Amino acid sequence: MKIRKQFLLLFISTSHLFVYAQNTEPSMFTKEANEQVVKSLPFENKQDFEDATRGFIATIDEPSIIDETGKEVYGLTVWDFLRQEAPASANPSLWRQGQLNRIHGLFEVLPGKIYQIRGFDLANMTFIRSDNGWIVIDVLLSKETALAGYNLLKKHVENLPVKAVIYTHPHVDHFAGIDAILENAPNKPETIEIIGPKGFFED
């Protein structure tokens, strides 16, 4: 419950920032600073958008990821306001980064070997095909978002046994979705090795 409250607060804060950006007239200093950002960076170069969409396989059809009771856990349309141009009160570089981050779904990173779930949560979930099954790196913030991504992999790639799960660090959005893997992998949970960095439980 604490995790979901933190997640909800993040969305509320983001929404408030957007409303503030839309309804607040920026100072001349802010306008000039943001105009300078436009002049100093190659915004006409769209290579990063090509990179962000390369290898796209599929995403879910639903506008949000829900839990067992039907409550929304993660809204995929909450970032749709980023489709428009950055308002004068927003840093255009950060706005563009947000546009890249809102791209979601299952992606093939290395053909036949590495796949990634993006935009379903605060972090990315990566699947590496080993000789005898999947190695999963980071399992997102919630069971629901991790399961949505895991189901995409099983549907569009392959439902292999999960041999190991790796937590890269102890931020909650990198480990809290573990039940989605343990409860839905074709092999028993006790056969899945979980690996974390030294001091994981101390941070």
Predicted feature residues:
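Bacterial N-terminal signal peptides
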Residues: 9-16
